Design a protein with these regions (language model features):
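Short histidine-centered beta-strand/loop micro-motifs
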Residues: 20-22, 42-48, 64-66, 72-73, ...
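Short strand-connecting beta-turns/loops that link adjacent beta-strands
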Residues: 27, 68, 95-97
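Residue-level recognition of conserved beta-strand positions in structured domain cores
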Residues: 32, 58, 65-67, 84, ...
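Ligand-binding loop in jelly-roll beta-barrel domains
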Residues: 75, 84-109
Length: 109
């Protein structure tokens, strides 16, 4: 058994968003995501087969959900449940420092 800290090895600069899988079973996947000024490429949307619960642990981000008039701004501690196949995209993450997300992907019961 290993003890680790979610804020260990958080880089100060990244050419691409970093995704670390912390736990994976057939029913659930837990990821730490680090973004520094990253966004979903223009015209692309996430359309995932699993539900995703995400929380911002550090930094800030804006998420767009298809069909909603305004982006959702997420600050430290803000979380969001994205149901399977709800199309969404990351519009912006803070370029001044790392945004650290914790994402839990799970099957619909």
């Amino acid at each position: 058994m290993t003890t680790r800290n979610l804020f260990d090895d958080v880089p100060r600069a990244l050419p691409a968003e970093r995704v670390d899988v912390l736990l994976e079973t057939p029913a659930v996947r837990l990821e730490r995501i680090v973004s520094i000024g990253h966004a979903t490429p223009p015209g692309e949307w996430y359309d995932q087969a699993r539900n995703e619960w995400v929380v911002v642990l550090r930094g800030r981000a804006r998420v767009r959900i298809e069909g909603e008039a305004e982006d959702r701004t997420l600050d430290i501690g803000d979380h969001l449940l994205l149901r399977a196949h709800v199309r969404h995209r990351v519009e912006w993450t803070d370029p001044a420092g790392p945004t650290v997300w914790l994402a839990v992907f799970f099957n619909t019961a």
